[in-house]
């Protein structure tokens, strides 16, 4: 591929084509079909919702202006984590503050490519690109020209201009395959560049806390080093290493490739949260995806990990220890942004009320210092929120959007999930929000506090009755909700499978994480419920996003094909058949003569 033909001659005309395609899609009224294969849908919707306010679709390519660097950092995007920049921004900010002599730059070659070449969101390439249905089979991406274009035409362009010694990839559970595919191609073309991998996604590799045995690290000899745990100090040590065995052995938290064998060093202690510098996102402010997702909102991180252990959630496996910054440290960051004219913030924490007393103190200090801000973040429904004064405090401090793992309104389902199980308490929380929003009308707090709902459809012990309770609750409290952030058809992961089947001795017919049956539901039950949920969301007029439906539709299509094959296609065993006998296909197996023919289904 001639990269100059893509980047240089007429970028404006290509951007115009992107705008036209997106506008056609928006005008058509097409809704999000399945987020698992749709990276850009949300971005496009956000852009066009704001276009009337003067937001232009722009994206700056840094191929030409990037200077030589010691290391380039990138993360292959995945729709499940909109704040995917936070990890690599944290690494660069650490280097800038504590090791300014090192040159590190963040690049986003995949978004460069997708900006000019919007993918077929229901195509095979993008399905493979987002790690879901064929986990660990990264080589399947090599059947598609796009992965070569991304690696050689875009990532390679940065390498040739910046001449880095290192290329670092940050991985999450949904981008591992595309990362491996790109990293291998880069190593083959640029063998002198050291390939580094870090991020929470390393815990999915075969040695991790949430291991997938199919991710066999010893086969990834194109990777030079893996950072495990808090990566800031490990990353700095890697960049300063002379790459001798003695030097590499001395770096805690490092897993490194020694002539094809990976050596696991001792783990590194966690970094004190207040030692982390304020993340600097300035190098991304002219990035199409970043601008479209965040617009004028500033991402912040107040904590790492989560103190709870929801049955379906992997966060505690990735980050076992929950810890948070001091209130004063967070206030210092907020005040710094306010002085720069910023007032909208979104917290990338897994949970902002993991310590309710800490959040109460933060809110009180925000009010005390007169900070006029708006904050959104992930919130767990808790007993403290049954006190209406708590909700009033949150709103006065600027908390206006709670993304909450509501999941279900069934007590048995919530109990097995290890969620807040008091459904009457949940109702009281929503009633409190409704009351506070009503009493704030006509005041400076008139902008309502709203929930961004997360719902799981088809959990292990969810019956049709349980599911209907959830839909009824959503409809009843529609006025307290901004959107259905995620409505996910349930996928069964290995840890929960073992608990359900082997520890609890519950009935389970299991084929894979999509194709499983319990006493309460089947795969087709779950698919039917997600369709029913969508009908409800449309009827009550709430924005929504569906996750994992495509995987269930693929299963349905596969089962229908198998059924059709079993019913219609019967061939005659060639050993029994003679030259004089005709070849006959029987649609009805009962019509097959016996014993002359042996049934052989294909």
Cite the ranges covered by each PLM segment.
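C-terminal accessory regions of radical SAM enzymes
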Residues: 3-10, 26, 34, 72-82, ...
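N-terminal [4Fe-4S]-dependent radical SAM core
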Residues: 34-37, 41-67, 257-299, 571-572, ...
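Conserved Radical SAM active-site core
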Residues: 53, 97-100, 109-141, 145-164, ...
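Glycine-rich beta-alpha loop elements in corrinoid/cobalamin-binding modules
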Residues: 70, 94, 103, 144-267, ...
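A short, glycine/small-residue-rich beta-strand->loop->alpha-helix junction that serves as a flexible
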Residues: 77-86, 171-176
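Short beta-strand/loop segments at the ligand-binding rim of alpha/beta enzyme cores
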Residues: 190-199, 372-376, 449-451
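Structural recognition of alpha->loop->beta junctions
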Residues: 209-236, 393-401, 469, 473-486, ...
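Radical SAM [4Fe-4S] cluster-binding motif and immediate context
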Residues: 274-448, 457
């Amino acid at each position: 591929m001639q990269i100059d033909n893509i980047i240089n001659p007429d970028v404006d005309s290509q951007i115009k084509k992107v705008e036209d395609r997106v506008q056609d899609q928006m005008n058509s009224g097409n809704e999000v079909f399945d987020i698992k294969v749709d990276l850009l849908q949300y971005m496009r919707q956000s852009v066009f919702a704001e276009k009337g306010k003067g937001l232009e679709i722009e994206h700056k390519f840094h191929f030409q202006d990037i200077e030589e660097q010691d290391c380039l950092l990138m993360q292959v995007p995945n729709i499940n984590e909109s704040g995917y920049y936070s990890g690599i921004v944290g690494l660069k900010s650490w280097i800038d503050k504590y090791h300014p002599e090192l040159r590190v730059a963040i690049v986003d070659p995949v978004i460069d490519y997708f900006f000019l070449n919007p993918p077929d969101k229901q195509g095979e390439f993008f399905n493979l690109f987002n790690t879901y249905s064929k986990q660990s089979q990264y080589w399947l991406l090599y059947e598609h020209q796009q992965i070569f274009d991304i690696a050689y035409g875009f990532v390679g362009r940065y390498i040739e201009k910046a001449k880095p010694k290192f290329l670092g990839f940050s991985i999450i559970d949904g981008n591992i395959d595309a990362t491996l595919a790109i990293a291998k191609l880069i190593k083959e073309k640029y063998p002198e560049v050291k390939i580094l991998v870090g991020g929470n996604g390393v815990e999915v590799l075969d040695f991790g806390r949430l291991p997938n045995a199919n991710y066999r690290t010893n086969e990834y000899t194109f990777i030079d080093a893996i950072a495990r745990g808090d990566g800031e100090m490990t990353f700095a040590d890697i960049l300063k290493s002379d790459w001798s065995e003695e030097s590499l052995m001395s770096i805690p938290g490092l897993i490194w490739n020694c002539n094809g064998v990976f050596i696991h060093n001792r783990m590194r202690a966690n970094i004190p949260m207040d030692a982390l510098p304020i993340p600097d996102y300035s190098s991304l402010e002219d990035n199409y995806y970043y601008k479209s997702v965040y617009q004028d909102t500033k991402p912040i991180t107040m904590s790492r990990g989560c103190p709870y252990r929801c049955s379906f959630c992997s966060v505690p496996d990735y980050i076992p220890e929950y810890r948070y910054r001091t209130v004063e440290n967070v206030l210092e960051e907020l005040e710094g942004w306010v002085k720069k004219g910023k007032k909208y913030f979104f917290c990338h924490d897994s949970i902002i009320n993991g310590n309710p007393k800490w959040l109460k103190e933060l809110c009180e200090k925000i009010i005390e210092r007169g900070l006029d801000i708006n904050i959104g973040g992930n919130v767990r429904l808790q007993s403290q929120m049954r006190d209406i004064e708590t909700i009033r405090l949150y709103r006065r401090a600027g908390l206006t959007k709670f993304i909450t793992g509501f999941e279900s309104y069934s007590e048995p389902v919530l109990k097995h999930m290890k969620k807040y199980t008091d459904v009457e308490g949940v109702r009281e929380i929503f009633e409190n929000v409704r009351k506070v929003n009503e009493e704030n009308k006509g005041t400076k707090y008139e902008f309502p506090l709203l929930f961004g709902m997360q719902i799981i459809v088809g959990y292990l012990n969810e019956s049709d009755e349980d599911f209907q309770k959830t839909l009824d609750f959503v409809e009843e409290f529609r006025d307290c909700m901004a959107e259905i952030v995620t409505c996910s058809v349930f996928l069964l992961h290995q840890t929960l499978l073992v608990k359900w089947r082997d520890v609890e001795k519950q009935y389970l017919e299991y084929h894979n994480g999509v194709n499983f049956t319990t006493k309460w539901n089947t795969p087709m039950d779950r698919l039917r419920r997600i369709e029913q949920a969508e009908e409800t969301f449309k009827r009550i007029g709430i924005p929504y996003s569906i996750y994992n439906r495509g995987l269930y539709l693929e299963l349905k299509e596969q089962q229908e094909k198998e059924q059709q094959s079993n019913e219609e296609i019967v061939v005659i065993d060639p050993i029994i058949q003679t030259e004089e006998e005709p070849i006959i296909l029987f649609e009805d197996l009962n019509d097959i003569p016996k014993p002359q023919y042996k049934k052989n289904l294909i």
